[in-house]
Each structure stands twice: as C-alpha cells, then as structure tokens.
Amino acid sequence: MADSDDEYDRRRRDKFRRERSDYDRSREREERRRDDWSDREWDRGRERRSRGEYRDYESRSRRERFSPQRHDLSPPQKRMRRDWDDHGSDPYHSGYDLPYSSSAGGPGYGPPQPWGHPEMHVLQHHGIPIQARLGNLHQVDLGTPAPIMKTFKEFLLSLEDTVDETEAVKRYNDYKIDFRRQQMQEFFLAHKDEEWFRSKYHPDEVGKHKQESQASLRNRLSAFMFLMEKSWLNEVQLDIAQSPAIIKVLDAAVIKMEGGTEIDLKILDEEEEEAKREAAKKEEAPVTETEKVVTEEKEAPAKPENDKEDESEEKPVKPQEEEEKKVEKKVEKEEPERETRKPGTRKRKRSGESDDGSDSESDTETASPKPKAETPNQNGRAEETPKKEEDTEKQKEKQKEDTVKPRPLHKTCSIFMRNIPPNISKAEITALCKRYPGFMRVALSEPQPERRFLRKAYVTFDRSVNIKEICWSVQNIRLRECELSPGVNRDLTYRVRNINGITLHRPIVRNDIKLAARLIHALDERAVLWEGEQMVLAQNPILKNITDYLIDEVNAEEEELLFSAGRTPETELPKDGNPTEISVERDDKLIKVLDKLLFYLRIVHSVDYYNTCEYPNEDEMPTRCGMMHVRGPLPPNRVSHGEVAEWQKTFEEKLAPLFAVRETLSEEESIKMGKKDPEQEVEKFVAANTQELGKEKWLCPLSGKKFKGPEFVRKHIFNKHAEKIEEVKKEVVFFNNYLIDSKRPALLEVKPLQPPVGAAGQALAAGLLYPHQGPPALLPYAQPRPPVLGYGGAPQFPPNPYGAGRGNYDAFRGQGMYPGKPRNRMMRGDPRSIIEYRDLDAPDDVDFF
C-alpha cells in the first residue's frame, strides 16, 4: 500500500532530523557553558554572580547527567529555567533557604548546611555535637544559652552622651558585678537539686561526703602501714626497670584495701610464677623450632636416592600399617585381661548368665574394671568397697575445698558510660546495676561544663562475671529517657610510665625529698589523718628523721685550704668535654628514702608525684591504684647546671596546685557578690507567709489558719513550722557555700568572636557578626535560626541605605563570602579572577560613616 502525501511530506521534513538534533544538542551544551561564565556580559554576570555557586554547580552536573530531550515532533526547545533559580534583583539571596532560616517558609531542599563559611569551623567549640555541626539542629538539645557580657564599647552605646569617662567606668564595673551575681543566682537555681551540686555545697551532704572520704583515707593508710611493716617497700625502687615489682606492690595495696588477707596476697606470687613460665615457654619455642630445622637439613643429604624412592612408594601404605599396629596392641592388652577374668566368668555362668564363648570387645572393656574391685574381697561384700572409696574421695575433696584459695581481689571488670546527664543520681545507677551478679561499686566523674555538665560513669563488677553479657543487657535499658550507651572498659595496659631520667641526679633527688615531705605534711594536715585523742598532731612515722637527708654536706674547710694554696679541689677538676656539664650522679640511699615517701603519696593520698597530679575518687574506680609514674633510665649524655635548675623550677611550679588550699572569697567580696544573711532571709520567709485578708484577718498559707494580727502569724510560724525555718537557714548556708568558693562551677564565659580581617585590610564588621549571627550553639533551642553563611550563601545583614551596588557588591564580590578571600578547592566555581574597573581614589562605603 502506497504512502499518503502527508506521510511523504513528513519524511522529507525529517530527512536531516538526526543531524539537526545533534547540532542542537551540541549548541545547547556550548551555550550552557558560555552562560556559566559570568564575565561574558557585565549586566548578566553581575546578576548571576549573586547566586550561590553551589547551586550552579549542582544544577549543571544534574543537567549534564541526564539524557537530552527528544526533538522528534517539535522544534528545539529553549532551556527551561527553574523557578527557584530566579531571584530577581535581590543581590543577597543565598543558594538555599536554610531549614532554620527565619525567611524560609518551610524546610529547605538543599543538603545540610554547615554553621557558616567553611573556614568558620575553626572558630567553633569542640563541645558542639556532630549533629549540630552537620546542620541537624532538630536532633540536638543545646540547652539554655549562656548570656554574653557586654564589652565596654557596647556598654557605652547604652549610656547617655552626658556621662563622662570616670562615671562610665564606674557604671561598667557595677554592671559586671550585677551580671556575675545574676549568673551565679541562675546557676544555683538550675543545679541546686542535682546530686553532684548538693554533695559539694549542701551542709548535710557535705558532712556525709567528708565522713566517707575520711573512712577511705583511713583504709588506704592501714593498707600502706601493713605493706611497710611486712617489708614490701624495702627492695623496690621507683625505676622503670622494676615495673613488675612496682605493679606487685600496688596490687598488694589494692588487695588489702578490698579486705584481703595474707593468703590472698599469695596470688601475686602465683601470677609472677605463671608469667615466668610463659616467658620461658616463649623463649624455648623458637629454639626448638630452629633445632628441628637444623636436624632436618642434616638428615636430608645423608639419605640415598634409593631410600627416597622407597619412601615415596611406602607413603600411601602408612595409614593401613598404623591401623594394623593398633589392632595388634589391643589384642596383646586383651590377652592378660582374659586370663585374670577366667574365675569371674565361670561364676557368672553358674549364676545363669549368658554362656556365649565369644564376648565382644566392648563387653571386655566395660567389664574389666569391675573384677579389680571385687577380687580382693572374698566374703561376698564386693559392692561395699567402691562406696568406701567414693566416701574417702569426697572427704579429700572437702578438705581441699576447706583450704582457702587466694582470691584475685585486685582484678575487676567494669563498664564505662560516657554521657550521664547531671540529673541522674549515683543511687539510680547503683539500683540499676545491682541486679546483676558480681556488682561492686559505681564511680561518677565531675560534671564537665564544656559538655553540658555531662558525667562519666564506671560500674565495677567482680572478675568472675561475663562482663559482655551484662554490658549487652544494660545497653537496652533507658534511664529517665536517656540511653546509657555502655561499653566494656579495658584493663590498664601501661600502669607504670617513666619520665626523664634526670630525676636520678642527686641534687634533684634531695629537692624531691624536701617537696614530697612538705606535700605529705600538707595533705595529712588537711585530712586530719594523724590527730590523736588529745587533739595533738602526732608525727607521721614516715617523716621521722627526714631532716637528716635534707641537709647537704660540703667540704668547705678543705676547699678553703686548697684555694688558699692556689690549688683547685680534685672533685671540681673539669673532666673531658664541656666544663659546664656534669654527669648524672646517683645516690641509692637518698633514692630509697624518696621512694618510700612517693609510695605513701600514691597509696594513701592518690597523688602521682612525678605526674604532678591527684587521681580523684580513686576508691570508687575499677582499679583503686592504677597508674604510677617513675624515673626513667639514666640519660646517655651529660647534663648542664642550667638544665638541672630549669627542671627543678618547672617541677615546683607544676606541683604548686597540690599545695594550694581551697580558696574562698573574702567577706567584703562575698557581700559584694550577694552573700545572704540567714536572719534577713528568715524575716523575708515570715513576711512572705503572712497574708492580710482584711481588717484584723491574717492568714498563714503554710497551715491555712487565720489570725487577728501579723504578730500571731509570726509566732505560729516559729512554733509550728520550725522545720521550715531550718530549711530556709540551710538554703542560705547552701548558697553561701557555693558563693564563697573561688573555683565554683559555672557556665563557660563566652566571648564574642572577633571578625577576621580580609586580604584588603577590610574587617568583616561590614556584615558578618550582627547580633543575630552569634555562634549557633549560643542561640536558644527551638527558635527560628537566621540564615547563616553556607556554600555560596550571602551574608545576612540589613540593606545598606547608601545603597547602590558598588560598595556592597565589590566588598563581597556578590557571592556571599569573605572579602578578598582567596578561592580554594572547597569553594566550587570559576577559578579565574573577575576583570572589572574600579576607581581606586573613590572611598569605600564603609568610610561614609
């Protein structure tokens, strides 16, 4: 059938359809590339540069990834412009409306934006959670933001012009005191019901905490005195070479703290022997392997070729030969057994048992042990003998059980919980973990202000439990809608760590003895450890005769005589090398005295001397004597006098905080900061609970009773509600204890970020940090967030009334980034600089002010 005219015309029109579509496609691609270069046309480039580079890059890659449109039945279409790409003439519109933007009507359609310009991540605090840094604010509760104190410059803006400088400074100082006082009051009200806060400052809780710490100190002191009496410390030196012996002493102290006996201490010797055996096995294993290799190499060339062929032929026959040998051995074993069993088998035949002549091998094996027990008995009481033997075996086992085995009290298992909210108490975690077998104790760290006062928890169990099963079961439990997220805590790997070997030098050792003795005296006096019944400070036995080692002996007379004779003493003759350098001189007598002091500090007061730190709450931790720093090996080179002096100076500075007593504010400063008077607060409480209902009608809201006058209400409150009065007084003491503590916990003081300076010397004050553009972590949660600098997002600030385009555009290049900021790989876009005309003599818009 012939084609119609219309079909023929259509074919003629579409004769070059493929070539035309390919041309259109290539032309469209070329146009697209040219359009993306914003420096082709001045006006179009100015408008397009205001858009986000990230959007252009994303849309371009998305268009190129899809297949081109079909042009079969229609002329080539013009490239479609998306509605959200057209921002009109708004030069400050960012590429995306961010999901927490105040201008966004709904959720944004872009990827999660960071907190700002990529370079601003350096300025953020490490405490911001990862969800917040990725832009997922709805997943993070940032808590109450801390108010920022005004700078003096900002404070001046709120004052009148008539105020002079001295008055302004005075008012600013008053403002700072009021601000801190308000901060302190708010912090106290926010945390006064939390356990960690009450244990520090509440009068009732402080007394309990002191009693517990005193009891633990006494326990640790008794453990140390036991070790000293039993001569555990005599042969141990705090050198890195004696690490196993040091660990053994620390473990022995832990066993005594846990209530262990001398029998329990034997397990340390057993562990030491096992360690030696394992080390010997490891040494023997490589030796035996090398010997085998040597013997095989010697035997290999001695065998002739014929033997090798015979071996190759006999190899497949070996398993059969082995089976035959096994059968022969079994037969040889069975023959004597049958000879001994003959009288027994005859008796069984007479008693009516089976008369089969051939017994199976299994029968012979099972029946063989029975006649051994029966043969010695000839009176027919063969069944009683095995019972007696069983009884004797049970008695022996009981005797073995009665002998007490040493317990590994120094080893524990523990679970670590990283983020415990401050409102969860220690008693709640204890009640949760107490249901599991082997539970011992719970340790909670101090709250961390930089991490929203979260705490770390260590739950200790006995070594015999399966800690992974307990950890898995705890992982599925929520406490106050909080996931505990526990993990198994590993044992300490390096319990003994070393510092510089210069500490072996005799002058440094003598200085350390002096410092350690002072520190022991200060800590003992603070803890009232050696105070007897007569309230007289008894002397610590470890400090007896300590002054004998603090006095330096010199040969002054000999040196004077030699000097007058014009000779130098032999001890000071310069050796080879630099005369200002000296070799490290070791004095074992002084070191022995020092080590006893350092063991006392470590075991009793949990002070690691060479690490210049105190381990808090160590009695509640999984390892009650965990880590200790000791002296390292002798330095290979000689040391100078300057190095020795510098070491002593820096070490004393690091050790100074351990000597410092808890500082408190003076009476004048505390009154200035808002210290409360108990009597005044009681009067305020009485006045607040005395309500006038009418003429000669007064009400006590505490009980609901009515009285004729206020004096009767007052008398009623003091008589019937004395416990309320006591609560008010305790609350006042509670607040004052927090107030006078110079190291009281508080919200971190946030300082406003200083705007960085651009390459051209222009500060970013032209629009980066307006009041609504502080750090995101400081903005209140669940509040609409202002737009933040993102990928290509323009800085958000009020439009410049002096308007035009040149100052605003030139300052930020119309692209919402830092002025004059050099491009890098993170900022996608055209790497070439924009060629433009700029009048260098014209002032910038920022200079109009």
Swiss-Prot record:
Record field: compositional bias (Basic and acidic residues): 8-73, 276-306, 314-342, 381-405
Subcellular location: Nucleus, Nucleoplasm; Cytoplasm
Residue ranges with Acidic residues bias: 354-364
Pfam family, one: SERRATE_Ars2_N
Keyword terms of this UniProt record: Cytoplasm, Nucleus, RNA-mediated gene silencing
Gene Ontology MF term list: nucleic acid binding
Chief location bin: nucleus
Complexes and interactors: Interacts ncbp1/cbp80.
PANTHER family: ARSENITE-RESISTANCE PROTEIN 2 (PTHR13165), SERRATE RNA EFFECTOR MOLECULE HOMOLOG (PTHR13165:SF0)
The name this protein goes by in its record: Serrate RNA effector molecule homolog A
Gene that specifies this protein: srrt-a
